[in-house]
């Protein structure tokens, strides 16, 4: 009887255990968690090679049993193959695995990884469950197996890339391969850089020289390119930071901006969104990586330069306009500058609508303006702000049928109207050349700029060539804006004055040298002022001295505008050079001349409907104030008769066609003019 009872008991125990053991067969094992730089890195051993979905849970108390999952937070899910570096494996044609830790061992094909970004400070525990394809989630929890037993302290911080390996890319150049796992949550230190968590994005670092030769170049690839493209810009010993604008679907890339919150990164069938919001995920990731590189490598943060062709050129233009405080200067070749303008372009709206929606809808973004305004460089160039815009050296082709030529005209107009400076070259080239100029020969121009040194933004030079109307048959076939005038790099930037030596400049083409003009006028706006700090509304004095004979040929007063800009218009530049001095009234050794002409200021350089115009009259006599188009035709008169002091005028352009317009003020034989751009 005893033996019979024992046998029955064994059968009963096996009957109870077998279903339990079978249920546990889907449980992951070896769960490990490490927290650093605001992210928790979870790895585990998988129950099988393929066909699994994993769910990641967290709680502030230990997860010991299935019932504990009820109160736990589901932070994410992932599928098979997270151990495998799909991007690099495809690029190199061989299998690569991720490493969780810098210089740590690569994961094996029986492991998985998930990276969770912390959104609060505190202690956490984690558990991971598995679900086989066609089955249900196995919610078994075994402490120390698929649930962490060790208390983990998490804190909010900016995520950092993890070093993976060294790769030889070209000519014995060694690129340090890093991976930044994405976050879809905004924190105080870093905005979301994807709409999914734990997606691996590559970046690369090519180590360069120590100080003082520690220049950093930001290398942005063209559409369809990759982070392994790290061509040297000036020297093979330059530091280089590469990025990867990569979408694992037919849309290829986000044009260095981002995509809709509901966009599926791995789908080829994304529908065009009609509602919701577009976010600058890629832009946020790029800015974060620039900050990481300048903080963690021995590079000079004052000498960071962006460089790129095609979509890589677009990267530079929009970086200069939106994050100009992070880059000293930008070199851009054949860039797309308006993602809503496809005139004379092989690109077309349907290529981008799954990411951004249709231009007619113009969905909102997380950056304060509709998406197609944010992706229009002319709009960004016209934004009135104290925010720094980096200088741009740009090349465009009038016969470029990939990105199109017509889009450049409103952008050029906005840059000039808002006195942003930079140089804009063009010739008759297509997207890949050849043309009448050598774009590569201008790369060296960006090296004169530093983030910690003032420079003069030159605009509206009288010797500018004519880019035309956007029709490739109109305007000059080869030309440039503001390339016919130059300055001496020894700029005076003191507490009481700012000075620069201006001089005419010759233009190099493939057919020879275009001689420098013997005389020109140009608008000058000091940028990145270090010591000559002035406040809006301050009245300053200026003089222009002809260097050939030392004569002060012209001078006057200029008012600091609401955005702290000092804009001196129509400065004469002579063959032997002109020294422009801007200073506080009453500086020792400098006279205090009376105002010689009216002062004009407008609250925005690009006007959509209305603008506020300010005028300061130098005397008390008869005065005129009128609006003109580019042909010189007077459209409206705001003032005719005696005037004195200061006045504000509301300028309504709602019924005016888009284009460039001038306001001219005259009194006592002296006049001043101001130009702005109208867009609708």
Indicate where each model-derived feature is located.
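Short beta-strand element of the alpha/beta-hydrolase
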Residues: 213-223, 231
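Residue-level detector of functionally pivotal "anchor" positions at catalytic/ligand-binding pockets or at interdomain
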Residues: 584-614, 618, 679
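C-terminal tail/sorting-segment detector
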Residues: 611-613, 637, 642, 650, ...
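Pro/Thr/Ser/Gly-rich low-complexity, intrinsically disordered linker/stalk tracts
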Residues: 24-52, 135-163
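The feature captures the conserved acid-bearing segment of alpha/beta-hydrolase catalytic domains
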Residues: 338-445, 449
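Alpha/beta-hydrolase active-site loop
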Residues: 267-298
